[in-house]
Amino acid sequence: MAKRVKILVVGDLMLDHYIWGSCERISPEAPVQVVKINNETYTLGGAGNVVRNLLSLGANVSVASVLGDDEAGKKIKEKLAELNVKDELILTEKGRESSIKSRIMASHQQVVRIDKESVVKINLEDELVLKVKENLANFKAVLLSDYGKGVLSEKVCQEIINECVKLKIPVLIDPKGSDYSKYKNATLLTPNKKEASEATNLKIKDKAELEKAIKQLKEELNLTYSIITISEEGIALYDDKLHIFAAKAKEVFDVTGAGDTVLATLGYMLANGADIKEAIKIANLAAAVVVAKIGSATASFSEIEQLLNSSFGANFEHKLKSIEELEEILSQKGKKKVVFTNGCFDILHAGHVKYLARARELGDLLVVGLNSDASVKRLKGEARPINSQDDRACVLSGLGFVDYVVIFDEDTPLNLITKIKPDVLVKGADYKGKEVVGSDIVKEVRLIDFVEGKSTTGIIKRIKDAKNDDKK
């Protein structure tokens, strides 16, 4: 859809540190949870998430920043190297603390977050500006990702913006704080409604107030375009009048990092020569992709194209997960209630659809465990399944109320339930009075009535009877 253009990201690089564990008791020393650590993961945060989004879109990315001479700074450089992003424009400031946010995660919940960072202005302003200016002509767009940690001071912002204006390079900014004067003359900013309200001292409660605020930002800061992201409503643009581009999200699971995705996509599209309205439309689609995922996600152009071309807006193949992938995804679910059910779903019929729709109503995410072909044969006989596990998974993924499909090979889903630990376990009403596998692991078991006269066995019998009638 677009070319591999060179884009520069300047801003506050951070390290997101996740400590994954389980909590099974309260400490005898104080009324706090005891977390047993299982593993730890690191990922790029702050401006690093903008870098990740640009790479996902296909850009050739460089990053300029200032880090401390500490372990977190070294780890950030390691994570950039893993992504093949060079650190030649990153300076090291002695005595400065690199930003690291450590989150302790237990039983799918964030227990606590611990921040270690410097938020004072960097001492290497002149050196950073010089580095950027020396390389600026190589880039088709510059993105300033401001998280208020001291890298993007007024001097740094204005020197970079003014040089970009001279070279006619678009400079896009995700702003921070209430004083936007340091962003004057930029191509555009991407504040959300709350941030724009604080920057303009205007309460944005309706369309008229939105237009007043967005116009004020454009005029006071001499922006080429004025943009305000308005969450589930989409993106507002002011050129000579107000335009609102409706959001494309069908389902919203997590808005974490959506602002970074919008900034990255707008920058990428403008760098490729798109006009601002086309860029916003694609940014809306990219945001729809990431909010349908959990955690700080990214959107690729293949995902955007699938969403653009699909009348359902569904990305079927991305619903099918391995047990390991699903375990990691659900560990970041936050307060969302996960519902689980399982079955063969060999020939999907109206009874299945109504059953699954009712199951989804019991929570926020519906995970369907699907018996593998080998598992179905053991349970139903050599003549089954009629449809392969891949075909059955594809059909289930096409249902809007099914969030994830996971194939398991055992006769029962006990191992799967043990690993993903859903909140609600759903079975058919025929399990009344029987032991439900996994009931001791979940918080709640719900039984749902089947639709009378609807069954896979019945459908197969009718097909066979019809064939026999044809032979007579």
Swiss-Prot record:
Q: Might you report a single GO cellular component term?
A: cytosol
> What InterPro entries does the entry give?
Bifunc_HldE, Cyt_trans-like, PfkB_dom, RfaE_dom_I, RfaE_dom_II, Ribokinase-like, Rossmann-like_a/b/a_fold
GO BP field = ADP-L-glycero-beta-D-manno-heptose biosynthetic process
Please provide, alphabetically and separated by semicolons, the GO molecular function terms listed in this UniProt record: ATP binding; heptose 7-phosphate kinase activity; heptose-1-phosphate adenylyltransferase activity; phosphotransferase activity, alcohol group as acceptor
Report the CDD domains cross-referenced here: RfaE_like (cd01172)
Query: Which superkingdom?
Result: Bacteria
Pathway, according to UniProt?
A: Nucleotide-sugar biosynthesis; ADP-L-glycero-beta-D-manno-heptose biosynthesis; ADP-L-glycero-beta-D-manno-heptose from D-glycero-beta-D-manno-heptose 7-phosphate: step 1/4; Nucleotide-sugar biosynthesis; ADP-L-glycero-beta-D-manno-heptose biosynthesis; ADP-L-glycero-beta-D-manno-heptose from D-glycero-beta-D-manno-heptose 7-phosphate: step 3/4
Q: Where is this region: Ribokinase?
A: 1-315
Q: Which UniProt keywords apply?
A: ATP-binding, Carbohydrate metabolism, Kinase, Multifunctional enzyme, Nucleotide-binding, Nucleotidyltransferase, Transferase
User: Catalysed reaction per UniProt?
Assistant: D-glycero-beta-D-manno-heptose 7-phosphate + ATP = D-glycero-beta-D-manno-heptose 1,7-bisphosphate + ADP + H(+); D-glycero-beta-D-manno-heptose 1-phosphate + ATP + H(+) = ADP-D-glycero-beta-D-manno-heptose + diphosphate
Please state the Enzyme Commission number of this protein. Answer: 2.7.1.167, 2.7.7.70
Q: Where does ATP bind?
A: N192, K193, K194, E195
Catalytic-site annotation from UniProt = D260
Q: Where is this region: Cytidylyltransferase?
A: 340-472
NCBIfam families the record matches: cyt_tran_rel (TIGR00125), rfaE_dom_I (TIGR02198), rfaE_dom_II (TIGR02199)
| Described function | Catalyzes the ADP transfer from ATP to D-glycero-beta-D-manno-heptose 1-phosphate, yielding ADP-D-glycero-beta-D-manno-heptose.
Family under the similarity heading: In the N-terminal section; belongs to the carbohydrate kinase PfkB family.
> Tell me, how does this one assemble?
Homodimer.
Protein known as: Bifunctional protein HldE
Q: From which organism does this entry originate?
A: Campylobacter concisus (strain 13826)
